Amino acid sequence: MFKRSFILIVLALALLLSACATPTPAAAPPAAPAAPANPVLRMSTTTSVNDSGLMAYLQPVFEADTGYKLEITSAGSGAAIEKGRTGDADILLVHSKAAEEEFTGEGFDEVRIPFMTNYFIVVGPEADPAGVKTAKTAAEAFKKIADASAPFITRGDKSGTNTKELAIWKAAGVDPEGQAWYTNIGAGMGQALTVASEQQAYTLSDKATFLAAKTDLALLLETADDMLNTYSVIAVGPKRFADTNAEGAKAFIDWLATDKAREMIAKFGVEQYGQALFYNMDK
């Protein structure tokens, strides 16, 4: 009896040791998303989300999560929207409300969703000869610049920022066209900031591109009530262009609404600049 019990104990120990020695199978890596039927998604963006680095930050994660491949072109919002109007983009990421509403009113869109914000800012020389720092609104700041005949750089490219700038001049009761102090460069935000820095001039910028540009200009006015900058994502409607990648556009819009994407947007810029560059809107 004792011998039989001893044998059973030995066998049990052997089985236990064998089980311990067998490595636990590693967890299988998450399966890659199924390849979309049309994997290429043509995106036309405003320069600010591209020049700030936001799209380079979001793109690889979106592609890994969905299987789509983004082909991104960037220009001022007016030119970016025009790509949707000609069928050369599946999805738009822009910030020019009037131009967006005109586009949707013409029946080119499938859906338009405002999804994030930041602020336009007035930047200029540290010495601030026009006294912009004391202004309470952008319109007041622009009036001070005009009254001082201080140099001002305008993008002049029909972008969202340029459209906003012209609206501010109108609100200020000033027509800057033809004035010696008003220089139209017909270029993007990065170039406008470079020229403004070289000439120690004022300009209107989005905050994200300004921080990324690292010029010697000073941030003189921000977060005024008339400086809010809203970004929208627009899916180009397949009713106008049969080859539009509507499924890919929907996938991007759905992905933007995920907690993962919203957290990425909320954190963008915090580590490098100590502050977020864009803010999610409520779902």
Show which residues each predicted segment covers.
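C-terminal motif of bacterial Sec signal peptides marking the signal peptidase cleavage site
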Residues: 14-19
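Exported/periplasmic ABC-transporter solute-binding proteins
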Residues: 21-23, 27-65, 69, 78, ...
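Acidic, polar ligand-binding/catalytic clefts
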Residues: 91-117
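Serine endopeptidase catalytic core focused on the charge-relay Asp
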Residues: 122
